[in-house]
């Protein structure tokens, strides 16, 4: 049985697993560390045309996904996995972060409702206690790409996905890690000199204490310059 099971509700089932079928996520899928089901929302559509949307009350441009259709889809999904949490990628949602990802993984069964068109009827969110989640202050065509992004983050946190699980502690945003929630330091590899640019000599010194201090100071400088709001937590 997989550590994490995901149910994805979408009108474009062919978009999955997409990039999650490759590299670390793909290998983890093959090894059954995580698993997923796809439910095609159109299978629950109305009329012979399988309509899932309609005009908005109160006017406005765009079509809204119907609550009766989505309700039937969600009820079916919940019948397969009772103990689960429903997430809806939306620009109105709480911003997805590394800490948010860890919180999500407290549930071993997760449902993603991928919206399309102008969005979904608000009553669906209220009825099923749906958690809206945002991947940033920009608009995409639907919820599938944010779902892929969020899942990639979740999957690499699962035990057995990374060859060396300790690498997680030296990444950006890890509050309990080397950089204490800040951005990662600059990274270098061979050759020592490339296009006239040399690797910082301290990294070649072999002095682990000096190197660790350099890495932490670099992290603070980069965080202060690029993401100063993160420093309040440091």
Swiss-Prot record:
InterPro entries: Alpha/beta_knot_MTases, tRNA_m1G_MeTrfase_C_sf, tRNA_m1G_MeTrfase_TrmD, tRNA_m1G_MTases_N, tRNA_MeTrfase_TRMD/TRM10. Its EC number is 2.1.1.228. GO terms for cellular component: cytosol. S-adenosyl-L-methionine binds at residues 115, 135-140. One of its GO terms (molecular function) is tRNA (guanine(37)-N1)-methyltransferase activity. It comes from the Bacteria. Its main location: cytoplasm. It is found in: Cytoplasm. It catalyses: guanosine(37) in tRNA + S-adenosyl-L-methionine = N(1)-methylguanosine(37) in tRNA + S-adenosyl-L-homocysteine + H(+). One of its GO terms (biological process) is tRNA N1-guanine methylation. Keywords: Cytoplasm, Methyltransferase, S-adenosyl-L-methionine, Transferase, tRNA processing. HAMAP family: TrmD. Homodimer. Specifically methylates guanosine-37 in various tRNAs. Belongs to the RNA methyltransferase TrmD family. This is tRNA (guanine-N(1)-)-methyltransferase.
């Amino acid at each position: 049985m997989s550590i994490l099971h995901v149910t994805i509700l979408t009108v474009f089932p062919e978009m999955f697993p997409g990039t999650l079928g490759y590299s670390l996520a793909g290998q983890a899928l093959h090894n059954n560390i995580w698993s997923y089901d796809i439910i095609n929302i159109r299978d629950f559509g109305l009329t012979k045309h399988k309509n899932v949307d309609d005009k908005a009350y109160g006017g406005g441009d765009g079509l809204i996904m119907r609550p009766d259709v989505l309700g039937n889809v969600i009820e079916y999904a919940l019948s397969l996995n009772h103990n689960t949490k429903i997430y809806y990628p939306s620009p109105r949602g709480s911003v997805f972060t590394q800490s948010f990802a860890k919180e999500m993984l407290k549930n071993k069964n997760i449902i993603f409702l991928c919206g399309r068109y102008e969005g979904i009827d608000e009553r669906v969110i209220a009825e099923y206690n749906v958690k809206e989640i945002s991947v940033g202050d920009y608009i995409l065509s639907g919820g599938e790409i944010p779902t892929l992004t969020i899942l990639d983050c979740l999957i690499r946190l699962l035990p057995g996905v990374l060859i060396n699980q300790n690498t997680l502690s030296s990444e950006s945003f890890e509050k309990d890690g080397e950089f204490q929630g800040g951005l990662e330091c600059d990274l270098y590899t061979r050759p020592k000199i490339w296009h006239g640019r040399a690797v910082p000599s301290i990294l070649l010194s072999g002095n682990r204490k000096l190197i660790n201090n350099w890495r932490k100071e670099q992290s603070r400088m980069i965080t202060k310059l690029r993401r100063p709001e993160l420093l309040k937590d440091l």
